[in-house]
């Protein structure tokens, strides 16, 4: 998916004036116009109005400082013919996918693993050692994939490939700090204004923009904001043929209330299961999230009308929308009021008693935040139970080795914020972004 701001001028691969640099790029740079003006002021001359060309001139001007100046969803690679160096980066949230294969002197990269199949040097091998992780949490919680020697470039990271050596560095890290200097009303205005500006930035395109709409607050908020400036924006919703499982009536009711055209389709059980094999092929790796099926049909329907859609994904991680974030507040209060030794004792006793109201709270209240997170996100808490599903034994890490290193990096933060930070580096990156990326849909 290439740039839309300059449909003709943005053709790729794109070269600089003397042909020494070449760039390929997937995504959107929302602040490309501001960067373009800055580069023109620095003496650069542009032949197009595309953001691909901004990347080329930006690399000439700023080198590996370029990714830190970009606002958007992107992956890009620039080859420097003079230095025989390859440079690339992925956006800070990992919205756009980037896979690479690095083995026996062969370096391949792409937005999809299946693109590597066209190269005769690519060895398609199952990465069996990662099966225990996948069965435990339903995704691979690191840079590896289910294919041997195929890796994911982490979000907020850039890489350099030179003389057969690959170097990966982080250019951005999500940081949290508490600012008590403003009132609730002031923060409400700041968030509202920032949200409106962000939605406007996402609509910079030469083609019509639509919106995905469910019955949730996040997508409803996006559609409502878009409709303020684009009254005839189309909303797209999907539901199930069995009404009791469908959110479609709520989405259509909201569309009607704000005066936005609603385009909807329904999925029945037969369609659901028939489409699953094809969907897994598109996603390259196994994906157990059931939302993949309705999303596939939603995207198929939307593409008949528009090329670009906005959605509300990522809001739960950013604004603390998941139930476990709210539960964490109660655990914090419990920890402040009850000494650790007493909490440990209460949890140990409760775990041995028959079920009673409050038992699970006492058991979880005796645990560390990473243990509570693991309990909420694991399919198999017992490695022995998980390993019984496998045909052979693998040297897999214990459950605590998956998430504890992430929590160790944010120990000084309150528990809800720790959960948000970990989700942004794991669940959102390896599940949500893969599921909702336009490349897969």
PLM feature segments, named:
Residues 31, 48-51, 70, 127-128, ...:
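Hydrophobic (often cysteine-bearing) scaffold residues that line and stabilize catalytic clefts
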Residues 27, 55, 159, 255, ...:
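Residue-level signal for inorganic ion chemistry
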Residues 49-84:
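Catalytic core of PPM/PP2C metal-dependent serine/threonine phosphatase domains
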Residues 41, 81-108, 175-403, 435-441:
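ATP-dependent adenylate-handling active sites, centered on carboxylate activation for C-N bond formation
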Residues 33-53, 79-185:
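N-terminal segments that mediate ammonia production and transfer
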Residues 1:
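Active-site loops and adjacent core secondary-structure elements that bind or stabilize anionic groups
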């Amino acid at each position: 998916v290439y740039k839309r701001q300059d449909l003709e001028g943005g053709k790729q691969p794109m070269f600089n004036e003397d042909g020494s640099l070449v760039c390929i790029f997937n995504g959107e740079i929302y602040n490309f116009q501001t960067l373009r003006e800055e580069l023109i002021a620095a003496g650069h001359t542009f032949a197009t109005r595309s953001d691909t060309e901004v990347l080329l001139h930006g690399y000439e001007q700023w080198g590996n400082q370029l990714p830190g100046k970009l606002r958007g969803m992107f992956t890009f690679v620039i080859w420097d013919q003079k230095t025989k160096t390859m440079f690339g980066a992925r956006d800070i949230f990992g919205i756009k996918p980037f896979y690479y294969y690095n083995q026996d002197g062969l370096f391949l990269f792409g937005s999809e693993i299946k693109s590597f199949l066209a190269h005769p040097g690519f060895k398609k091998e199952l990465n069996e050692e990662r099966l225990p992780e996948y069965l435990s949490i339903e995704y691979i919680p690191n840079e590896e994939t289910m294919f041997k020697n195929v890796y994911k470039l982490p979000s907020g990271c850039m890489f350099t490939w030179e003389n057969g050596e690959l170097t990966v560095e982080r250019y951005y890290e999500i940081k949290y700090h508490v600012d008590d200097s403003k009132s609730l009303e002031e923060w409400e205005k700041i968030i509202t204004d920032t949200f409106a500006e962000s939605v406007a930035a996402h609509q910079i395109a030469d083609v019509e923009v639509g919106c995905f709409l469910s019955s949730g607050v996040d997508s409803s908020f996006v559609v409502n904001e878009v409709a303020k400036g684009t009254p005839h924006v189309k909303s797209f919703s999907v539901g199930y043929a069995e009404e009791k499982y469908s959110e479609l009536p709520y989405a259509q009711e909201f569309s009607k209330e704000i005066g936005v055209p609603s385009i909807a389709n329904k999925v029945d059980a037969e369609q659901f299961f028939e489409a699953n094999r094809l969907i897994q092929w598109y996603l390259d790796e196994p994906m157990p999230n059931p939302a993949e099926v309705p999303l596939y049909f939603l995207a198929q329907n939307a593409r008949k009308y528009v090329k670009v859609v906005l959605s509300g994904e990522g809001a739960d991680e950013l604004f603390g929308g998941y139930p476990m974030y709210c539960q964490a507040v109660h655990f914090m209060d419990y920890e402040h009021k009850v000494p650790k030794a007493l909490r440990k004792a209460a949890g140990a006793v409760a775990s041995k008693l028959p079920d009673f109201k409050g038992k699970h709270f006492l058991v979880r209240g005796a645990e560390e935040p990473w243990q509570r997170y693991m309990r909420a996100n694991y399919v198999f808490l017992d490695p022995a139970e998980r390993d019984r599903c496998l045909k052979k034994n693998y040297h897999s890490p214990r459950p605590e080795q998956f998430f504890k290193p992430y929590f160790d990096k944010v120990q000084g933060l309150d528990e809800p914020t720790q959960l948000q930070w970990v989700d942004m580096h794991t669940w959102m990156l390896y599940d949500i972004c893969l599921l909702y990326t336009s490349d897969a849909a």
